Amino acid sequence: MMRVVHLIWSLSTGGVETMLVDIINEQVKHALVSLIVMNDSVDSELIRNLDKKCNVLCCSRKAGTKNPLPLIKLNYWLFKIKPDIIHVHGGGLGKVSLYPSPKVFTIHNAHSAPSEYKKYKALYAISKAVQEYTRGQGFESVVVENGIRVKDIRVKEDNSASETMQIVQIGRLYHPHKGQHILIEAMNILVNEMKEKIISVDFIGEGSSYKYLVGLVCKYHLEEHVRFLGGHTRKFIYDNLCNYDLLIQPSISEGFGLTVAEAMVAGVPVLVSNVPGTMEVIGQGKYGKYFETDNPRSLANSILQIKTDGCNRKRLKEARDYAISNFDISHTAQTYLAEYKRILNKS
């Protein structure tokens, strides 16, 4: 069987890390898979979710340290495993892994630095938007779209309007990229200017912007309308996403948008900023609504329009079918395995 090593800096809760676990759990059915985590940031829940057939190795490096021991560990394990392919998921890792197997790299966002791209046998973009960005940097890449565990997501059974419009935003609380402040600003317009009182937002996630975002909520006196639920397991999200009336992804920068695809599978309407990554997920507007990026009033008007118009059941079913057909994790994992074989056949 093919021996594959996935190499990543950390395994904390996030879109990249969570999806990597899902990919590995599919790939172990067809290959001998190892995961090497460089830093000491490891989420126990993600480790528990990994298939036992995956060989997990942690270098326990402290972020920022110059201690060479973790690098020695990394290369000791690589020479012991003798992988056929090394799949890298973080900038800088390719140049410190010395084993002479072909290395490939997944570009997860539209602000990756291309300084080490030449070291890889292949580059993979998670969306056409990221592929275009990478092409603009002078490098070609193959699109392998992100995937989700579609069978695990509970589906919304009743799309009738609830008394209070319940909105959810899921993701790392880092507003310069994820744009949560735009949603809070839009809530200020809706609640305090437009007097739309029967509306609420739940933020699910953790991150460095938490205090800033809480401060904005207090500034606009939105405490009765906005909640921060903290980080939650994937099971919690997949079980509860269907209870919401709308998912909003207000990103200022986004390579793909996993939570948007998850909401589509759950039968929940989606509203996204018109950045290329999220627009790609909703079929350029065919399977969801969008608003002008970094524009709270555009977002507020879009929310109000959705609240007024209600749900289009036919469109929601089409969106769900589209997401299931295009974003199933099994397809993502199989595509990568096929790519590995292609590269090995060329070597």
Annotate each language-model stretch with its function.
Residues V214-H232:
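Nucleotide-activated donor-binding/catalytic signature segment of Leloir-type glycosyltransferases, i.e.
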Residues G14-D22, M165, Y174-N192, S208-V214:
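A conserved mid-protein helix/loop that constitutes part of the nucleotide-sugar donor-binding site
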